[in-house]
Amino acid sequence: MRRSLLPRGAVLAATALAATVLLAGPARADGFDPQASVRHDNNTYVPRIVVTVTRNGVRSGATVTGAPSTSYAHPPCWYFPSWEGPELARYFDGGQASRDAYHFGEKFDPPAGYQDHQNDGLDKGQWWGAMCSSEYWPDEDIHAFLDYASQWINSHPTIWVPVGAPNPNDAAIVIPPEVLVHIAEDFLTLPAPTLAHNPAGNSVVNLPTWVWATDESFAEQRVRAQFGANWAEVIARPVGLRLSVDGPARVDSDCANGGTPYRRGLSAQATTCSVTFLKSAPARTVSATLVWDVHWEGSDGTNEPLDPPATPEVGSFTTQVDEVQTVVDGTPAH
């Protein structure tokens, strides 16, 4: 994937199939390509970013927190070493900056104190510029990336980094919530429902078999990914149960709230989720998936819906279906 060094504030808008890159600093006349310096598979200039991931679930009304996990991320914007001191001084003092400014229709302001380093080679230090790449922006909204990248670059000017000084990325790196949410999604696991039913033994033809998801499986799931002060949390709430049967039956296919647990004394009409088998069978399997409402929240105030899983996990049970037998012995009553 080709990247070009652009004037500060300029935008290279590629097609939807290619990355969009923003780079701070003036264009170099020698055709310098930052790809040669910034290795994305083994980037020595960007610290390895460790994102903390925590998972919470609700069980029987109580919140259960899992052990924290870690993930790794590449920031969408970072600093990279670009110009040597004499190069940058020649660029501005030799007139090339003015010619490029005319070509791009922009004003190029030199970094503060650039003449102080006009004789400083790599043994003294190097100028570092800001770079952003949509390769590390997992959201398909390219306009959101451009807005974020423009703000980041405008607030991170080209700086001189002396030899032996800390990597400027140590303080500059930020992972925005828009990136963290995808890490949280990767860690989100939505369980299959654990099903209970009544009768607990064999079912009976033409009588409803109650079905419901247990409290332990019909439970909210949360995953939060955090780096520094930024975080994104994905919240998945079960809102229903979908049933199917591998044979002839009347089925409440969409059961709100996971079904109604059976209690002695409840009428047959009290159930919100049942299967009525129409024929006897040695074995019938009832399968179910949970219906999830999923959204995410971020440290920046974001609260947006997310798509539920396309192929949710399936829970099931197998039951024998019997006919009701009525026996009349013909003995007259006395």
List where the protein language model places each region.
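Short acidic/polar micro-motifs centered on Gly/Asp/Asn
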Residues: P238-L266
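A short, structured loop/turn motif at beta-sheet edges
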Residues: N202, S244-R250, L278-T285
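Short proline/glycine-enriched turn/loop motifs at strand-loop junctions of beta-rich domains
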Residues: F218, I235-V239
